[in-house]
Amino acid sequence: GCPLGFHQNRRSCYWFSTIKSSFAEAAGYCRYLESHLAIISNKDEDSFIRGYATRLGEAFNYWLGASDLNIEGRWLWEGQRRMNYTNWSPGQPDNAGGIEHCLELRRDLGNYLWNDYQCQKPSHFICEKERIPYTNSLHANLQQRDSLHANLQQR
């Protein structure tokens, strides 16, 4: 399953922030939650994230885990992973003013598409972590319960 506050889609769990942070702060916050800024690998994942963001009903924009901070125009996911799937808004990325280097999921005319944006600007963000297969998480919980039970019996 997924930790409290995370939402499941296939093998991943996603957390949609209610707070706004710069790109770097958002990445740090996701690490604190033992996750990373969301990486969108395919259309299915994109549809889930866009659908969930839309259902939240807030016209928020969200940081995703990619930038072209290293080489202008070379967009990579966190961990230097190449982008095999993209869903840029028409005319994006445009590096407006020469200072847009971080990937934002932007609500435009009621639809969520990708946009490059200034990394230091505050935005909402989406964290992603791998889902723990249910059997393992249940087993871990039972182990914790058993060791807790054993500790209590020793007292």
Swiss-Prot record:
Keywords: Disulfide bond, Glycoprotein, Lectin, Repeat. SMART domains: CLECT (SM00034). Glycosylated. SUPFAM superfamilies: C-type lectin-like. Residues 9-128 form the C-type lectin domain. GO terms for molecular function: carbohydrate binding. It holds the Pfam family Lectin_C. Sequence repeats lie at residues 136-145, 146-155. Disulfide bonds join C2-C13, C30-C127, C102-C119. Glycans are attached at N84. May promote nucleation and/or growth of calcium carbonate crystals. Binds to D-galactose and D-mannose/D-glucose. This is Perlucin. It comes from Haliotis laevigata (Smooth Australian abalone).
